[in-house]
């Protein structure tokens, strides 16, 4: 009897299980979509991250800078010996170089001084470039010399070459810039060797383009070499588009590595604005323009 009762109870239980399987949610039904752990953990993209990490940590950066400055050092004796040698583009050379004292023109930021810490702060704050915060960094006078720059310019100065630092830092930042350069060991005998944006110069208009300041140097000096991380450090850019930049450089390609020496800067520059135009674009608009400029060779 107990066995019969047990069998009956078991049969009802099995029927109940079958009923549940039929009328309930099938165990094999696909679960609701969920966010994968990888997607949950993915950090927000930052256009500056890879470039800044490379600039601060990659040995290759220092090797490139040192290569450029050593190549310039090898060309310097010939440039000094040839009294007709001049590195100013034709639109900036307003007179004869005969009898002029020798000089070298260098940009400051990311050419002789390393400002990557200011970009690190920008990344950690989740912020875009800000002139006020940039001014704070400049006032701290903490920028370090880039590889090879100090040795080359110091040696050039010992050979009687005046170094002019033509920078697009604001003229109000001249004192901090001079102090930073001197504390880093660069040859700055006179404050007049630092020509910031807005410096009062007679005879030419002052703007972000450096042509006016190059002309001013050229009045009294024969410019042996120019150094920079932007095309505008060498020649005036009439049309800041990728094609416009190539066009303005085309007549001077033979000077590259001989009179003009370019340094790498993946952090910022007119190369970036050339992709999207004015600086009033939002970060999203700038990223869209950058992605559109990419070529996957398909």
What are the residue ranges of the model-derived segments?
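Structural recognition of the beta-strand scaffold that forms the well-ordered cores
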Residues: 103-107, 113-115, 162-167, 193-196, ...
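Bacterial N-terminal signal peptides
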Residues: 5-16
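Substrate-recognition element of Asp-dependent hydrolases with the DxDx(T/V) motif
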Residues: 110, 149-181, 193-195, 231
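Non-catalytic pre-domain segments flanking phosphatase-related domains
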Residues: 17-106, 277-298
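Active-site neighborhood of HAD-like aspartate-dependent phosphohydrolases
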Residues: 101-103, 112-147, 151, 158
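Second-shell loop/turn segments in exported
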Residues: 54-63, 135-142, 164-170, 201-204
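C-terminal cap/substrate-recognition subdomain and adjoining C-terminal extension
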Residues: 174-298
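Extracytoplasmic/secreted proteins, especially bacterial periplasmic and envelope-associated proteins
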Residues: 67, 71, 136, 144, ...
């Amino acid at each position: 009897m107990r066995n019969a009762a047990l069998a009956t109870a078991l049969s009802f239980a099995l029927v109940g299980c079958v009923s549940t399987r039929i009328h309930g949610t099938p165990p094999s039904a696909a679960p609701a979509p969920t966010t994968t752990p990888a997607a949950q953990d993915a950090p927000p993209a930052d256009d500056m991250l890879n470039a800044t990490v490379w600039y601060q940590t990659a040995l290759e950066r220092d090797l490139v800078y040192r290569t450029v400055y050593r190549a310039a050092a090898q060309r310097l004796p010939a440039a000094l010996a040839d009294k007709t040698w001049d590195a100013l583009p034709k639109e900036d050379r307003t007179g004869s170089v005969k009898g002029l004292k020798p000089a070298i023109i260098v940009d400051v930021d990311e050419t002789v001084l390393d400002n990557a810490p200011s970009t690190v702060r920008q990344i950690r704050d989740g912020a875009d470039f800000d002139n006020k915060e940039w001014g704070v960094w400049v006032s701290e006078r903490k920028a370090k010399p880039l590889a090879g720059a100090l040795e080359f310019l110091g040696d050039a100065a010992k050979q009687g070459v005046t170094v002019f630092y033509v920078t697009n830092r604001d003229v109000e930042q001249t004192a901090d810039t001079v102090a930073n350069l001197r504390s880093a060991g660069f040859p700055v005998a006179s404050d007049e060797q630092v020509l910031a944006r807005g410096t009062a110069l007679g005879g030419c208009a002052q703007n972000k383009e450096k042509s006016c300041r190059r002309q001013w140097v050229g009045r009294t000096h024969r410019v042996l070499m120019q150094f920079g991380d932007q095309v505008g450090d060498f020649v005036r850019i009439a049309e800041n588009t990728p094609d416009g930049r190539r066009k303005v450089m085309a007549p001077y390609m033979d000077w590259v590595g001989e009179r003009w020496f370019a340094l790498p800067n993946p952090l910022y520059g007119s190369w970036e604005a050339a992709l999207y135009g004015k600086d009033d674009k939002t970060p999203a608009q700038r990223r869209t323009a950058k992605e559109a400029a990419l070529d996957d060779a398909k």
